[in-house]
Amino acid sequence: RSTLFPYTTLFRSSIKKEYYQFLKENRYEKVSNGIYIHPEAFEDRNYILSLRYPQAVFSHEEALYYYGWIEREPIRPTLTMYTGFGVGRLNKEGVKVFTVKKEFLNEGKVMGKTFFGNPIPIYDRDRTICDVIRSKNWFEIQNYQYAILSYVKDDNKDLYQLMKYASMFHVKEKVRQTLELLL
């Protein structure tokens, strides 16, 4: 007797029926392919995005908000993906997407928690501020300045790590000029 079930065999069996029967009986609603939510639960936008696009990392304004470095929640989610990933669907959904070379995507990636306590991938403080300085023209000036000042005051910053990221992304001089007067 085999313990391996090909995808098609598994879903031809009654498991699929039982699964959908459970969802129906408990009034779960489809949010996306393979993702269902109970009508009494709060929809956690960022957690759902992380399930739908597991290779994406929350970044830029989304990370700034997570660390408390901007005052208001971003209107649009902000993700970083690897160059070459088709971002058209995400853009249509109102998600702002930045791209990097595939080998840099996971540099500085850590796991954070959404407001609802669900795990999501997000960049660490130093990678976040490096990305902000790299993408300065994308930010409103007051958000940019507030983020830089917040980073400088943050006890958990790691300037050595920041300069490693700055070197990796070829913005070492830009980072140095931005921070030298504040440190």
Predicted regions and their residues:
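Nucleic-acid-binding surface
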Residues: 31, 35-183
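Single conserved hydrophobic/aromatic residue that forms the stacking wall/gate
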Residues: 1-9
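Short alpha-helix boundary/capping motifs
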Residues: 12-13, 54
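Short amphipathic alpha-helical interaction segments
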Residues: 13-24
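A short acidic, leucine-rich amphipathic alpha-helix
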Residues: 8-12, 63
